[in-house]
Amino acid sequence: MAPVSATTQEVLSEVSRLPLHAVVELRSPDGRQVFLLGETHVKARRAADVCRRAVEGFSLRGVEHLQRDQVVAGQVLGPVLGAVREALEVLSGGGLAGSTIEVALDLPEGTTVELERTDRVPLGLQVGAAYLALHVALAVPALLLLPWSGAGWLRPLRVAVKTLGVHLYALPLAYALRDRPWGWVIQPLVTILTTRDQLLAEGILRMLETHPTEPAVVIVGRAHVPGVVERLVDQGFRRVAPAVVRRPAVQGG
């Protein structure tokens, strides 16, 4: 199997130096190169261009992509979060760009696999997605009505938002107990990270089994990188130390 080109390796090294981005190189049990690219879903235009060049160097790509038609409230969350990203891009005057995931999905060459497709969505993720939708459904009106926040008729909304805010303090405990099957009950939002980490790792294994000869890049949110790497290492993958890219020395005059 052909290795990733030196040019693509150098671009990946450049991605790893971008703020809030990460690149982890792994070797699958059969010796295949797999690069995990962790990104922010909204980024500076220059960062987006670098990530695009990195992804274009692969003919096999896997992406994080919440399955809206399978997840409770997915039909609400997807459009709302997408609208927020688009609004940020517009308000930045073109200085911000969207996710590399969308770039990968739109590439005409090669294969892009949505890794989170599954026959059965775990219950924890269903509850977590519904809970996130509840946060969005209450927080957005609260922000829009902020100028009238002192009005008595808004008191129930204020109480609900504060209650949800207090419950966020349970996230660290839920994350610490993430390996327990009941850990997500403490704070369902943790499943947006942990349960999806597991789905992503399983999707990567399926993708490599279906396409057994090509190196691959996997694009996920930056927060998913540690959990996905941990799960792949448990499946026999090996983490590769990043190569040092040496540039020619500049001769002084």
Q: How would you label these PLM feature ranges?
A:
Residues 1-253:
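Compositional signal for N-terminal targeting/processing segments
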